[in-house]
């Protein structure tokens, strides 16, 4: 019996060795990178500080490589463990240790835990479905719409203003010296960690009747693309202004359609192609008609456009991957929010730890109290905004949500121009109008086509039995 237990622990020891050896190898290579960047003679300087000290228009590329190197702290041991447990049929064994349950939950979605299952109790099963809820009156509907509109507007307008402030403005310390916060990844980490905690708390407070069935590792792909898109979004603000970024986000319809064609073999209507082209045309007019003296370099403009393009590519993959997960496993949006933000927190936390970015960001925070306030409010707005997104789509559907967010983008551009003194010519304003007209046209055509199809389905003659 003793020999059996001893042999039964061998897989756990091998799995732990994968993690330890990977971390040691990554630590070794990070030391080599520090030395190559000039940190050999100054051991007090972190890798994150060395990367930030590279004064170049292309320093963001080095930062990106270092970030991805940090993410490998999670990806590499995860991949090795996945291959190893499949090869030895580890999950079919009867030893129900904590490690066995954790790996089982990551690979198959089955575990003995309730944190993400959110709905396995008898009380949840007896709870009436949403479809049986009493129908709201017109006044109640109006109040609910105002609540959703106000929540989305306040949370995301505040988030947009603070996002631009943190990445572009100087903060004063206690001695009156000014400095900029540079670590975009720390902002991504704080946003995702708070969003994960909010989603987890909400699932515990109001469990969903839908049992969670998806393997946790499936969320890692959406998490990686999500943190990459967020990082590119923050970095882009160092090279282009916020109105440009907001308009560029409207153009993500094009990469979403392309990614849908590639991943899901999706088919699109002719009006979808027309509106996508109109949005692109409007964006070209806006870029041609907007100017910002603080970002006059051609290199920085091209860099900003490239960063925004990468943001749209990764964001498009996130949307399509999440859509495929919803179809395959039928989880609720809050379960998706919880799972994606869990892995996003793990990825960014591992990368920050490897670079020493935690200490740098915390040191900046202790010296600049206004930054702490802005960062906390930014994270709260991001988390609360996600809750309002899911609530609005659940109550009113995606069309109403799209209209609200389109109005939010228009107001965000005006706010940014007013607060941060961005100048836009008449050609730029015309480009903005084209973009928003195209978005509303797209929403109208979608609704119109859906109504026509419903009528055609209702008028279809029934076959006699």
From Swiss-Prot:
Domain of life: Eukaryota
Coiled coil feature spans: none
GO annotation terms (biological process): 3'-phosphoadenosine 5'-phosphosulfate transport; heparan sulfate proteoglycan biosynthetic process; oocyte dorsal/ventral axis specification; transmembrane transport
Membrane topology listed for this record: Multi-pass membrane protein
Coarse class of the protein's main subcellular location: Golgi
Reported tissue expression: Expressed throughout embryogenesis. During oogenesis, it is expressed strongly in the nurse cells of the germline. Maternally expressed at the syncytial blastoderm stage. Zygotically expressed, from after germ-band elongation in the invaginating salivary gland placodes. Remains expressed predominantly in this tissue throughout embryogenesis, but low-level expression may also be present throughout the embryo.
InterPro entries on file: SCL35B1-4/HUT1 (IPR013657)
UniProt entry tagged with the keyword Transmembrane: yes
Effect of a null allele: Flies display defects in wingless (wg) and hedgehog (hh) signaling, probably due to the lack of sulfation of glycosaminoglycans by sulfotransferases such as sfl.
Family matches, as Pfam families: UAA
GO CC entries: endoplasmic reticulum membrane; Golgi apparatus; Golgi membrane; membrane
Cellular compartments annotated: Golgi apparatus membrane
Keyword Coiled coil found: no
Alphabetized UniProt keyword annotations: Developmental protein, Golgi apparatus, Membrane, Transmembrane, Transmembrane helix, Transport
GO molecular-function terms, A-Z: 3'-phosphoadenosine 5'-phosphosulfate transmembrane transporter activity
TM segment ranges: 13-33, 61-81, 142-162, 185-205, 270-290, 299-319, 339-359, 370-390, 391-407, 424-444
Function: Mediates the transport of adenosine 3'-phospho 5'-phosphosulfate (PAPS), from cytosol into Golgi. PAPS is a universal sulfuryl donor for sulfation events that take place in the Golgi. Required for the dorsoventral patterning, suggesting that it mediates the transport of the sulfate donor required for the sulfotransferase activity of pip (pipe).
Family: Belongs to the nucleotide-sugar transporter family. SLC35B subfamily.
UniProt-recorded name of the protein: Adenosine 3'-phospho 5'-phosphosulfate transporter 1
Native source organism of the sequence: Drosophila melanogaster
């Amino acid at each position: 019996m003793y020999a059996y237990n001893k042999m039964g622990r061998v897989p756990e020891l091998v799995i732990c060795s994968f993690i330890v050896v990977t971390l040691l190898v990554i630590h070794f290579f990070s030391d080599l990178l520090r030395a190559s960047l000039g940190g050999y003679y100054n051991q007090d300087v972190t890798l994150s500080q060395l990367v930030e000290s590279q004064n170049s228009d292309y320093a963001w590329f080095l930062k990106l490589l270092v970030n991805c190197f940090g993410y490998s702290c999670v990806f590499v041991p995860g991949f090795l463990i996945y291959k190893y447990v499949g090869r030895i049929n580890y999950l079919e064994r009867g030893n129900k240790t904590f490690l066995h349950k954790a790996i089982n939950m990551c690979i198959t979605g089955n575990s003995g835990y309730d944190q993400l299952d959110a709905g396995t109790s008898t009380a949840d099963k007896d709870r009436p479905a949403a479809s049986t809820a009493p129908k709201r009156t017109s006044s109640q509907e109006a109040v609910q719409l105002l609540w959703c509109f106000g929540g989305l507007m306040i949370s995301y307008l505040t988030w947009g203003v603070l996002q631009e402030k943190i990445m572009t403005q100087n903060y004063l310390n206690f001695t009156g010296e000014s400095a900029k916060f540079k670590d975009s990844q720390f902002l991504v980490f704080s946003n995702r960690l708070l969003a994960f905690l909010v989603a987890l708390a909400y699932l515990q407070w109001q469990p969903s009747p839908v049992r969670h069935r998806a393997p946790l590792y499936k969320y890692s792909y959406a998490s990686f693309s999500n943190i990459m898109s967020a990082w590119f979004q923050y970095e882009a603000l160092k090279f282009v202004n916020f109105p440009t970024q907001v308009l560029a986000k409207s153009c993500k319809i094009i990469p979403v359609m392309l990614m849908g064609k590639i991943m899901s073999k999706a088919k699109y209507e002719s009006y979808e192609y027309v509106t996508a082209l109109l949005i692109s045309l409007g964006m070209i007019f806006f870029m041609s008609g907007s100017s910002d003296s603080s970002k006059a370099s051609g290199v920085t403009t091209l860099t900003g456009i490239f960063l925004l393009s990468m943001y749209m590519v990764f964001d498009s993959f996130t949307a399509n991957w999440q859509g495929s997960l919803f179809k395959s496993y039928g989880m609720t949006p809050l379960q998706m929010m919880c799972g994606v933000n869990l892995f996003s927190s793990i990825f960014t936390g591992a990368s920050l730890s490897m670079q020493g970015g935690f200490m740098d960001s915390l040191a900046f925070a202790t010296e600049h109290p206004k930054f702490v306030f802005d960062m906390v409010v930014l994270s709260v707005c991001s988390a609360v905004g996600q809750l309002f997104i899911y609530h609005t789509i659940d109550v009113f559907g995606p069309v109403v949500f799209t209209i609200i967010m389109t109005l939010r983008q228009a107001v965000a551009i005006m706010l940014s121009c007013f607060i941060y003194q961005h100048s836009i010519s008449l050609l730029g304003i015309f480009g903005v109008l084209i973009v928003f007209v195209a978005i509303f046209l797209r929403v109208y055509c979608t609704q119109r086509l859906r109504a026509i199809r419903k009528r055609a389905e209702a008028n279809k003659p029934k076959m006699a039995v």
